[in-house]
């Protein structure tokens, strides 16, 4: 029985990157032997065990054979006679198919270390094409390591395109697609993930709402990717990054229930959005509410941030109400970040955005400072409370504006 460290831990160690988790492969053992040693079995489809002390995963060496469509359509064979080289052969990329023994020696039958040194993401074997999830995984690794200079081997990219055209991507569950996407959003270069998916025709299958925006003459996706790239430098919040990409969806003028001719004139200049496409995206991928809410707010209100100082105070307060900023003030900063990334992409004047951002922050703090307690002490009840609160907030904003001028 021999135990080897494999996968991401070996790869990251060679790249001098942090190792967050360690996976092990066991050669020459049976499930019964693992149980006798105190390991706990956790794998359903193949023998994976948890170490009794470290709780790290130890998998018996295995081979896989394609039996049906999809990521789970494999028959696994795990036996003491399966070699380490056979186990490594089933892995996706050469850089993930390197093992290390207890002496620190590398076992690298597929030249993964060479590809690491040459900054190449390359498939291990032709069996790569059998698992559709690998399209997402390779795109994610491209996003994870783009800042180091990694690129995808051209033959590997061709295989990814074949998978995309085969229809097998449709067999992936929404949860699995989103899991890989969410990981990619946390990478240093999340825009590369979607760029790769576009290049290998996977975005048409997995994110059709985004892909359909592209035409031979114009592709708003490029703007979305640029906005995402800038947003990734401004924040590590994955929901903000995703909203920065998706703010390009469904451009359409949307009417507001505005309160005056001044507001109507201002809002005519703000292209807002149809929420149908974002609803489709959210439902199909089963996005968490945190993402859904920010996406909808971004599509509806991001444009207002760029002209926020031109809105009347009644409309500004309505904006605060609809975002529920009184209970969730962080939403304002999220919209400001997305707007900043978008304006930077379009070559906007940074000072202008900073002015609008500071204006809306100050206005919100002024409005939020109005005391509800004093209104209650004044004898107001039921509907009169909200009416009086709005009146006092308008009054406070008027006084603030007079002081500024």
Swiss-Prot record:
User: Per the record, what are the reactions this protein catalyses?
Assistant: a tRNA precursor + 2 CTP + ATP = a tRNA with a 3' CCA end + 3 diphosphate; a tRNA with a 3' CCA end + 2 CTP + ATP = a tRNA with a 3' CCACCA end + 3 diphosphate
Gene Ontology biological-process annotations: RNA repair; tRNA 3'-terminal CCA addition
Limits of the HD domain? 220-326
GO: which molecular function terms?
ATP binding; CCA tRNA nucleotidyltransferase activity; magnesium ion binding; tRNA binding
**Which residues are listed for Mg(2+) binding in this entry?**
21, 23
Names of required cofactors: Mg(2+)
Q: Which CDD domains match?
A: NT_ClassII-CCAase
Keyword entries, A-Z? ATP-binding, Magnesium, Metal-binding, Nucleotide-binding, Nucleotidyltransferase, RNA repair, RNA-binding, Transferase, tRNA processing
Q: Supply the EC number(s).
A: 2.7.7.72
Q: Does the keyword Cell division apply?
A: no
What is a single Pfam family found in this protein's UniProt entry?
A: PolyA_pol
Q: What Gene3D superfamilies does this protein map onto? A: Beta Polymerase, domain 2 (3.30.460.10), cca-adding enzyme, domain 2 (1.10.3090.10)
Residues the entry annotates as binding CTP: 8, 11, 91, 137, 140
Q: Which domain of life is it from?
A: Bacteria
Quick one: which residues bind ATP?
8, 11, 91, 137, 140
An additional note in the Swiss-Prot or TrEMBL entry is:
A single active site specifically recognizes both ATP and CTP and is responsible for their addition.
What's the stated role of this polypeptide? Catalyzes the addition and repair of the essential 3'-terminal CCA sequence in tRNAs without using a nucleic acid template. Adds these three nucleotides in the order of C, C, and A to the tRNA nucleotide-73, using CTP and ATP as substrates and producing inorganic pyrophosphate. tRNA 3'-terminal CCA addition is required both for tRNA processing and repair. Also involved in tRNA surveillance by mediating tandem CCA addition to generate a CCACCA at the 3' terminus of unstable tRNAs. While stable tRNAs receive only 3'-terminal CCA, unstable tRNAs are marked with CCACCA and rapidly degraded.
Family designation: Belongs to the tRNA nucleotidyltransferase/poly(A) polymerase family. Bacterial CCA-adding enzyme type 2 subfamily.
Name the HAMAP family on file: CCA_bact_type2 (MF_01262)
Descriptive protein name: CCA-adding enzyme
Source lineage: Bacteria, Pseudomonadati, Pseudomonadota, Gammaproteobacteria, Enterobacterales
């Amino acid at each position: 029985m021999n135990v080897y460290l494999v996968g991401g831990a070996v790869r990251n160690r060679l790249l001098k990157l942090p190792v967050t988790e360690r996976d092990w492969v066991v050669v020459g053992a049976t499930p019964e032997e693992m149980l006798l040693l105190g390991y706990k079995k956790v794998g359903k489809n193949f023998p994976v065990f948890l170490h009794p002390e470290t709780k790290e995963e130890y998998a018996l060496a295995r081979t896989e054979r394609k039996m049906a469509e999809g990521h789970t359509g494999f028959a696994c064979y795990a036996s003491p006679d399966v070699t380490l080289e056979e186990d490594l052969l089933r892995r996706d990329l050469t850089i993930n198919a390197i093992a290390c023994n207890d002496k620190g020696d590398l076992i690298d039958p597929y030249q993964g270390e060479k590809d690491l040194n040459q900054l190449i993401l390359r498939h291990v074997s032709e069996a790569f094409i059998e698992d559709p999830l690998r399209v997402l995984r390779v795109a994610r690794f491209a996003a994870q390591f783009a800042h180091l200079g990694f690129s995808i081997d051209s033959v590997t990219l061709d295989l990814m395109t074949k998978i995309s055209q085969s229809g097998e991507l449709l067999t992936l569950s929404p949860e699995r697609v989103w899991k890989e996407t969410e990981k990619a959003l946390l990478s240093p270069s999340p825009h590369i993930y979607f760029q790769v998916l576009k290049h290998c025709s996977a975005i048409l299958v997995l994110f059709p709402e985004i892909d359909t925006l592209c035409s031979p003459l114009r592709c708003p996706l490029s703007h979305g990717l640029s906005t995402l790239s800038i947003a990734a430098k401004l924040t590590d919040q994955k929901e903000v990054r995703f909203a920065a990409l998706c703010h390009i969806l469904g451009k359409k003028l949307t009417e507001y229930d505005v309160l005056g001719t001044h507001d109507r004139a201002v809002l005519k200049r703000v292209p807002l959005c149809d929420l149908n496409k974002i609803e489709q995206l959210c439902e199909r991928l089963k996005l968490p509410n945190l993402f859904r809410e920010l996406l909808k707010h971004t599509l509806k209100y991001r444009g207002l941030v760029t002209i926020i100082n031109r809105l009347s105070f009644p409309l500004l307060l309505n904006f605060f109400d609809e975002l529920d900023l009184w209970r969730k003030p962080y939403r304002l900063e999220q919209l400001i970040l997305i707007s900043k990334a978008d304006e930077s992409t379009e070559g906007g004047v940074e000072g202008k955005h900073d002015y609008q951002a500071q204006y809306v922050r100050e206005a919100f703090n002024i409005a939020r400072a109005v005391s509800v307690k004093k209104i209650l002490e004044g004898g107001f009840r039921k509907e009169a409370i909200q009416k009086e609160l709005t009146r006092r907030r308008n009054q406070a904003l008027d006084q603030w504006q007079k002081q500024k001028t």
